[in-house]
């Protein structure tokens, strides 16, 4: 089932808030299986003040965090996990391929490949204009 979630609906699922909410909308959601979200990267992002003032680049760790937030929406939409928190449990095989700069629109996709008990694994890919900018395997742990 595909669903569209705006920022207010995302905030009902995950606890992140400005300045650390890094997903603007979810355009595809298959509950407990996959999700696609978007982040409009603007020149006004707080992290560009220091990374780097003369050549602003979105930190790779924040791209991974944005992917993890989309993953949290996917896993927490599963009926048994609704109302809980998804913690970032780990990261494997992270690769950063291209810079993300002001004006870019990040497409953030995750496919949950394994859920066992309160833990899950997802394959995450971030793209800009159809080109991969980052990818990783993310691990999630569900808390109360």
UniProtKB/Swiss-Prot annotation:
Keywords: Cytoplasm, Lipid A biosynthesis, Lipid biosynthesis, Lipid metabolism, Lyase. It holds the Pfam family FabA. GO terms for molecular function: (3R)-hydroxyacyl-[acyl-carrier-protein] dehydratase activity. The active site is at 51. It catalyses: a (3R)-hydroxyacyl-[ACP] = a (2E)-enoyl-[ACP] + H2O. NCBIfam families: fabZ (TIGR01750), PRK00006.1 (NF000582). It comes from Clostridium botulinum (strain Loch Maree / Type A3). HAMAP family: FabZ. Transmembrane segments: none annotated. The keyword Cell membrane does not apply. Belongs to the thioester dehydratase family. FabZ subfamily. It is found in: Cytoplasm. It comes from the Bacteria. This is 3-hydroxyacyl-[acyl-carrier-protein] dehydratase FabZ. Its EC number is 4.2.1.59. Involved in unsaturated fatty acids biosynthesis. Catalyzes the dehydration of short chain beta-hydroxyacyl-ACPs and long chain saturated and unsaturated beta-hydroxyacyl-ACPs. Gene3D superfamilies: Hotdog Thioesterase. InterPro entries: FabA_FabZ, FabZ, HotDog_dom_sf. One of its GO terms (biological process) is fatty acid biosynthetic process.
